[in-house]
Amino acid sequence: MPSALVRALNERAHLPVVDETNIDAFLAPAAGEPDNAVLFFTGDPAQRPEADDVAVVLPELMQVFRGRLRGAVVRRATEDKLKARFNVVVMPSLVVTRRDQPVGVLGKIRDWSEYVEKISAWLSPDVPVMVSSGGPKVEITHAGKEIAR
């Protein structure tokens, strides 16, 4: 269950909640909408209390980048299915996208100036999109037998 601050992003800030069924539609901008979006991966607020801090910062970022950035909250139950696609390693994270491609990820809570500096840079049309890592590259073995990949 999301915290009250995360719920308020939908209720008060009118940020949509996206999941695997509607994220592609959200990331495809309608006529007149910016190509860039920010996705909020909250993680479990009970285990990651800084998610509430990011939930307070996000509406302020939306104000600063009004007209240049759209925002959405990723449904908690869907985060594990979507995090590899958007290069999310830690939670909470804000993912800045250009259409359906990530251009940057900010994990945990950051200093305000870092948010503004990095997001400003990522909104440039010249910034390359991130390449998915394809998952972990570590192989765990025991006595010569593969036990996990």
Curated annotation (Swiss-Prot):
Stored Gene3D superfamilies: Glutaredoxin
Record InterPro entries: NiFe-hyd_mat_HyaE, Thioredoxin-like_sf
Segments passing through the bilayer: none
Family: Belongs to the HupG/HyaE family.
Name the record gives this protein: Hydrogenase expression/formation protein HupG
Gene this chain is encoded by: hupG
